[in-house]
Design a protein with these regions (language model features):
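Active-site- and interface-proximal helix/loop "cap" or "latch" segments in soluble metabolic
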Residues: 23-150
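Bacterial N-terminal signal peptides
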Residues: 8-16
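Sec-dependent signal peptide cleavage junction
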Residues: 15-23
């Protein structure tokens, strides 16, 4: 969720600096390979790219009128020898496309799937300005939300 909040804040700040238009649209993408694993001790490795996406529209008053979040979590297995073991033709579905099949509900303290939590955050942002979103989402020094989950 840290990346999602950062994307919203960055997009709103950039869009808020543009000239007053009927609606201004933005798309932010943040990618990370931090979940990748090296092949070690004869075990296979995993290359993983997590791309977090936020699309939003801001009105002439700087209020968010539309907000959508998604994450593409692309995992590519490889052998200790470096050969790709993943199905190169397999479709990579985003977390929104997976819905309940993503499987976060059981690990969620509030019993919500990833897409439900992302949709709730997006709904929270609609109707607010950048300043209101920032003020309403308390975070620690690492950017993790410190308030109650949605």
């Amino acid at each position: 969720m840290k990346k999602i909040v950062a994307l919203v804040l960055a997009l709103v700040m950039v869009l808020g600096c543009t000239a007053a238009l009927a609606d201004t649209y933005g798309l932010g993408i943040s990618s990370s390979i931090g979940s990748s694993k090296d092949a070690a001790d004869g075990a296979d490795g995993k290359a993983q790219v997590d791309s977090t996406v936020c699309a939003l529209a801001v009105d002439a008053d700087g209020k968010i009128v539309s907000c959508l979040f998604d994450v593409a979590q692309t995992k590519i297995g490889f052998s200790a020898a470096g050969a790709i073991t993943a199905d190169k033709t397999a479709e990579v579905k985003s977390k929104q496309e997976l819905g309940d099949d993503y499987g976060m509900r059981g690990a969620s303290g509030i019993g919500k799937e990833w897409n439900e939590q992302a949709d709730a955050l997006a709904a929270y942002c609609v109707g607010k300005t950048y300043e209101e979103v920032v003020a309403g989402v308390a975070a620690d020094e690492k950017g993790y939300a410190t308030g109650a989950d949605v």
